[in-house]
From Swiss-Prot:
InterPro entries xrefs: Aldolase_TIM (IPR013785), Methyltransferase_A (IPR040072), RNA_MTrfase_RlmN (IPR027492), rRNA_lsu_MTrfase_RlmN/Cfr (IPR004383), rSAM (IPR007197)
Radical SAM core domain segment(s): 97-329
Family as reported in the entry's similarity comment: Belongs to the radical SAM superfamily. RlmN family.
Recorded name of the encoding gene: rlmN
Protein name from the UniProt record: Probable dual-specificity RNA methyltransferase RlmN
Highest rank taxon of the organism: Bacteria
GO cellular component: cytoplasm
Cellular localization per UniProt: Cytoplasm
Cofactor(s) required, per the database record: [4Fe-4S] cluster
Organism name: Koribacter versatilis (strain Ellin345)
Signal peptide: none
Statement: the UniProt record of this protein carries the keyword S-adenosyl-L-methionine: yes
Transmembrane domains' residue ranges: none
HAMAP family in the record: RNA_methyltr_RlmN
Length: 346
């Protein structure tokens, strides 16, 4: 606006319209004079909300959005009303009110990390999302759900498609916009990483910093290398060293997520090894029983194994929660995002 010779309040009007009122086109910007709107258009300025290509609704109220960008690429964003099954990293259930919800956000189209238990890995990495595209997902979902962030408690989890720390700069810009412009504080955001050690260090230095969750999923290097090939580059020793040096805030705990695969990483011995890994850390653990998907050769663990695993960690003094699956019937649960149009499990 300054380059166009406009007063400062025009920038505030634009900011308010984009991020708070979620205006989807310049023609709808009635707070701006028509000549200014035309000047913005002629200079190439445009608003491009992601297009809601498909919407799938689960029996539990979860909605999986397939959102398309201007280049034709699409990602999934998940809306979880009335609680998130522990997605915020504390295992708690939100109150029975539509005024509380969680949005699971993608940071890339596809993913390069190649976790063997995750359907997104089958896509490979197609491209990074810009900061605007990351924020645009959230604005599109809030607009579609007709939610006012000033009247509702909205949590964000960067746990959709992609590894946020492999698109770090755009992720950080998006977080800043979400906190300062959209009005969702970083205390209501959680980002999950597969263990990009240098970026964990960088993340700890940010002034505006969401909560951190580390996707662990194995209790030793041998198992983790097979399940998460990124371990070949950053071993558990390096990952846990970064976790121990991470500057936690007062009363903050680092979350470790652990996807339990039947007969693979769900034994009592695995649980005891996790206890040793986390010893001395101010940590909590979210256990996730694997959510099935086609072309993925694993099985969901026996519920008794999940509970036994949890009890060993609790007995060791580690707060441990079993995350309830949300949207499993529409392929919206953890590890199921692959831009599929399937809505029921075979």
């Amino acid at each position: 606006m300054e380059r166009l010779g406009q007063p400062a309040y025009r920038s505030r009007q634009l900011w308010q319209g984009l991020y708070r009122d979620r205006i989807a086109s310049l023609d709808q910007f009635t707070t701006l004079p028509i000549p200014l709107r035309e000047e913005l258009k002629s200079s190439g300025w445009a608003i491009a909300f992601p297009f809601v290509q498909k919407r799938f609704t689960s029996t539990d109220g979860t909605v999986r959005y397939l959102l398309q960008f201007s280049d034709g690429q699409s990602v999934e964003t998940v809306w979880m009303p009335e609680g998130d099954g522990g997605e915020q990293g504390d295992g708690s259930e939100d109150g029975p009110s539509y005024d509380r919800a969680t949005i699971c956000v993608s940071s890339q189209v596809g993913c390069a990390v190649d976790c063997q238990f995750c359907m997104t890995a089958l896509l490979g990495l197609l491209r990074n999302l810009s900061a605007g595209e990351i924020v645009g997902q959230i604005l599109a979902v809030l607009k579609d759900e007709n939610v006012d962030v000033e009247k509702s408690r909205i949590n964000l989890v960067f746990m959709g498609q992609g590894e946020p720390f492999l698109n770090f700069d755009n992720f950080v810009k998006a977080v800043t916009l979400l906190a300062e412009a959209v009005g969702i504080p970083e205390s209501r955001m959680t980002v999950s990483t597969s263990g990009i050690v240098p970026r964990i260090v960088d993340f700890g230095q940010l002034a505006i910093r969401p909560k951190l969750a580390i996707s662990l999923n194995a209790s030793n290097d041998e198992s983790r290398r097979e399940l998460m090939p990124i371990t070949k580059k950053w071993t558990l020793e390096k990952l846990m060293s970064a976790a121990r040096e991470f500057p936690l805030r007062n009363r903050e705990r680092m979350t470790f997520e652990y996807v339990l695969l039947g007969g693979v990483n769900d034994s009592e011995q695995n649980a005891r090894e996790v206890v040793q890994l986390l010893r001395g850390l101010r940590a909590k653990v979210n256990l996730i029983a694997w959510n099935p998907g086609p072309e993925i050769p694993f099985s969901t663990p026996d519920p008794q194994h999940v509970e036994a695993f949890q009890q060993i960690l609790i007995d060791a003094g580690i707060p441990t929660f079993i995350r309830k699956p949300r949207g499993r019937d529409i392929f919206a649960a953890c590890g199921q995002l692959k831009r599929t149009e399937l809505v029921t499990l075979s």
